């Protein structure tokens, strides 16, 4: 039994589960692609570049590829895909040291970050709009979920590092300020004195 596909066209993807679901799902790639990166870094980068081609004009990242790897589903509604995409690109860049890869992916990083920032309706630096659609699809989260907010803060930290490495200082400074504001709001909103609440 295999769950990976590498086409003659050079496309690569893995099923979310054996014989089911989509290929190269952003959320499952985020959770389970360390082995691919460690053993076949070029295949991992290829997956990410394939996904970047299908980034929507407003910055939203795809959920998964169709079985023939020629397109993506219409599921652009999951709000954790963008931060996961940014974190994956940063991880792959830091692991491989491939600055050309980072430069190719940079416009997609900017769009993904800008789109997620639009989900901050109250200006506290954390997403709070349309946060129900995410990887935990059976959980009815609302408002500012700790899961989404923590991914966003991690993506901000990663984006600052990538911006600095590319010499994009204005972006680095803006995201660093947002990271500081969001980190403060994360504790104020979600810490209940014993643990971080699921959402606030």
Task: Enumerate the predicted regions with their spans.
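Aromatic-rich carbohydrate-recognition surfaces in CAZymes
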Residues: 21-126, 144-163, 176
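Catalytic cores of carbohydrate-active enzymes
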Residues: 3-8, 13, 24, 30, ...
């Amino acid at each position: 039994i295999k769950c990976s596909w590498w086409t003659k066209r050079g496309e690569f993807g893995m099923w979310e589960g054996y014989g089911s679901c989509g290929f190269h799902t952003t959320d499952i790639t985020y959770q389970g692609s360390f082995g691919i990166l460690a053993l076949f870094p070029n295949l991992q980068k290829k997956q990410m570049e394939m996904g970047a081609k299908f980034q929507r004009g407003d910055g939203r990242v795809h959920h998964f590829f169709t079985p023939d790897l020629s397109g993506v589903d219409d599921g652009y509604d999951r709000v954790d895909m963008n931060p996961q995409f940014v974190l994956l690109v940063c991880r792959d860049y830091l692991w491989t040291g491939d600055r050309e890869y980072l430069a190719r992916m940079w416009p997609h990083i900017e769009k993904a970050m800008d789109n997620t920032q639009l989900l901050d309706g109250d200006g506290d630096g954390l997403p709070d709009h349309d946060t129900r659609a995410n990887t935990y699809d059976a959980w009815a989260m609302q408002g500012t979920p700790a899961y989404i907010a923590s991914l966003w803060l991690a993506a901000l930290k990663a984006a600052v590092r990538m911006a600095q490495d590319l010499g994009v200082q204005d972006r680095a400074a803006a995201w660093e300020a947002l990271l500081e504001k969001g980190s403060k709001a994360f504790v104020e909103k979600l810490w209940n004195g014993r643990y971080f609440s699921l959402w606030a």
